[in-house]
Structure formats: C-alpha cells, structure tokens
Design a protein with these regions (language model features):
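Catalytic toxin/effector domains delivered as secreted proteins or via bacterial secretion systems
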Residues: 2-103
C-alpha cells in the first residue's frame, strides 16, 4: 500500500527530522513512532522532554498502572507447595503473560 496519498507518515526514533539533537531517553518508551507532517514541515513527538533534553513522559503510556505488570511481581503468599493459585491469581498470571508477550 502506497503512503503517497497520506499527508503524514511515520518513522522510527532512529531517524531524526529535527534540526537540533536531543539526548536519548533515560528509559525505553512503549512506542517510538513519531509523526512528521511533510506539508507543514512540523515534527510531533509522542514524548515530553524536560529542559535538560531528557524525555520524561511517553504520551502513549498511562500515568497509573496496575501493581502486577510482570509475572514475577505476583506473590503467591504463604501456602502449601502443592496448592495451586486461586482464580484471581490465575487471572493475574494470564494477564501479565499476555502483556509481556508483546514486548
């Protein structure tokens, strides 16, 4: 599919469309897709940068997140070693596994 009829195109973070260089981010963003409008020549970043040049916020990530982002963060608590996780814990495990599979 050709991108010619579209006014905006996407490029990765390695391709710089700005005239001034920024330092790399301190943390890896969830997305590294920025938008460049070829008609106006404006570059819209999905990250907010501080005065020191470091990115401190990725606009695609939420401010508040669930405490169980990773499978290893879920604690089983004190239980017998042969006891299986309950329904809520299984649900959290599956959710964390799905979330980690896209990274």
């Amino acid at each position: 599919m050709s991108r010619k009829p579209y006014k905006q195109f996407h490029h990765g973070k390695e391709i710089s469309k700005t005239t001034y260089g920024r330092k790399p981010m301190k943390w890896f963003p969830w997305t590294y897709v920025d938008t460049y409008n070829a008609d106006t020549g404006r570059f819209r970043s999905r990250r907010k940068f501080g005065t020191d040049g470091w990115a401190y916020k990725d606009l695609d990530t939420p401010d508040n997140h669930k405490p169980y982002d990773h499978v290893h963060d879920i604690q089983k608590g004190k239980r017998a070693p042969d006891r299986k996780p309950n329904k809520q814990e299984r649900k959290e495990f599956e959710k964390a596994k799905k979330k980690r599979s896209f990274l």
